[in-house]
Structure formats: structure tokens, C-alpha cells
Swiss-Prot record:
Keywords: Ribonucleoprotein, Ribosomal protein, RNA-binding, rRNA-binding, tRNA-binding. Belongs to the universal ribosomal protein uL5 family. InterPro entries: Ribosomal_uL5, Ribosomal_uL5_bac-type, Ribosomal_uL5_C, Ribosomal_uL5_CS, Ribosomal_uL5_dom_sf, Ribosomal_uL5_N. Disulfide bonds: none annotated. This is one of the proteins that bind and probably mediate the attachment of the 5S RNA into the large ribosomal subunit, where it forms part of the central protuberance. In the 70S ribosome it contacts protein S13 of the 30S subunit (bridge B1b), connecting the 2 subunits; this bridge is implicated in subunit movement. Contacts the P site tRNA; the 5S rRNA and some of its associated proteins might help stabilize positioning of ribosome-bound tRNAs. It comes from Bacillus mycoides (strain KBAB4). Gene3D superfamilies: 3.30.1440.10. SUPFAM superfamilies: RL5-like. Part of the 50S ribosomal subunit; part of the 5S rRNA/L5/L18/L25 subcomplex. Contacts the 5S rRNA and the P site tRNA. Forms a bridge to the 30S subunit in the 70S ribosome. This is Large ribosomal subunit protein uL5. The gene is rplE. One of its GO terms (biological process) is translation. GO terms for molecular function: rRNA binding; structural constituent of ribosome; tRNA binding.
């Protein structure tokens, strides 16, 4: 069993039950899934860029991403409906906990001038979104093989009903929020 999942069952669940006065263990919020999305703007003119992004996301997440396609045509961006413009991967279960552990303990501390993640990035429904400016913070990415520095969005979907519950859940998991 994963280190974080064990911590969730043994420490976090009882702590959240006492703090929010839950009557049942099933009421305790948990992390449902983590979605990693990267937009590849230059995929329109350069199809190799998308292949590189897919390769990097595969290394970071440990599973093959889905290529996302344009919903609408936008002439200003020289974009046709159905053109590939990005990649996303959804992690659940074991891989989700492993990725979250790696994100909190290894990757985020490698960000330059890191003072913690914003407390304001909750969506009002208990989900947390985090933007990463460069993929180099992940240990799997080899600096010499990177063709272009790409950012990504990491969305942590929880079963929490409010932002306060979700913030407490992520804090217990070790998410470094700003003071």
C-alpha cells in the first residue's frame, strides 16, 4: 500500500472526522482523481511538438495521455475544429497517490523561489488547480532532451463539499500552502 494512502487511512481520516464532526467515515473527503493537462499551442504548425509533449507527460504521469482536440475553429489562431492541440492524463488510485507524493515531496520544492502554493486556487466545490510553469521540476524529465519548456495544469479533484474541507485535506497530505 502506498505511503500516502496508509497515512490517509490511519491519521488523516480520524483527524478530519474530529475537526468537521462527521458521523460516518464515508463522509470524510478524499482525493478522487488528479488530471494533468498541457496545451501545446505550436502543435498547429509543428506536429512534432505534440509528440514531445505526449512523451513528457507519459514520463511524468506513468501512463499514456489522451490527445485533446480543438472544439471550435478559430481563424485568429489558424485553428480548425478537430485539430490536436494538447494532451491530458487522468490518474486514479495507486498511480494518483504516487504522483501526488512525488509532486509534494520532490517536484514542488524544486520550483525556483518557491514559497508555497496559493490558497486561492480552489474552485468553490472543493477542487484544487495548480499551474506549473515548466516541466523540468519533475525528476523524470531529462534537462538535455527538452526541446521546449512547457507548462501544465494539475487539477486535484476531491470529494469535499467545501473549499475549507478540501484545504484541510490537502494540508494534512502535506501540500505546502503559502503562510
Amino acid at each position: 500500500m502506498n505511503r500516502l494512502k496508509e497515512k490517509f487511512q490511519k491519521e488523516i481520516t480520524p483527524a478530519l472526522m474530529s475537526k468537521f464532526n462527521y458521523k460516518s467515515v464515508m463522509e470524510v473527503p478524499k482525493i478522487e482523481k488528479i488530471v494533468i493537462n498541457t496545451g501545446v499551442g505550436d502543435a498547429v504548425s509543428n506536429s512534432k511538438a505534440l509528440d514531445n509533449a505526449v512523451e513528457e507527460l507519459t514520463q511524468i504521469a506513468g501512463q499514456k495521455p489522451v490527445v485533446t482536440r480543438a472544439k471550435k475553429s478559430i481563424a485568429g489562431f489558424r485553428l480548425r475544429e478537430g485539430m490536436p492541440i494538447g494532451a491530458k492524463v487522468t490518474l486514479r488510485g495507486q498511480q494518483m497517490y504516487e504522483f501526488f507524493d512525488k509532486l509534494v515531496s520532490v517536484s514542488l520544492p524544486r520550483v525556483r523561489d518557491f514559497r508555497g502554493v496559493s490558497k486561492k486556487s480552489f474552485d468553490g466545490r472543493g477542487n484544487y488547480t495548480l499551474g506549473v510553469k515548466e516541466q523540468l521540476i519533475f525528476p523524470e524529465i531529462d534537462y538535455d532532451k527538452v526541446s521546449k519548456v512547457r507548462g501544465m495544469d494539475i487539477v486535484i479533484v476531491t470529494t469535499a463539499k467545501t473549499d475549507e474541507e478540501a484545504r484541510e485535506l490537502l494540508t494534512q497530505f502535506g501540500m505546502p500552502f503559502q503562510k
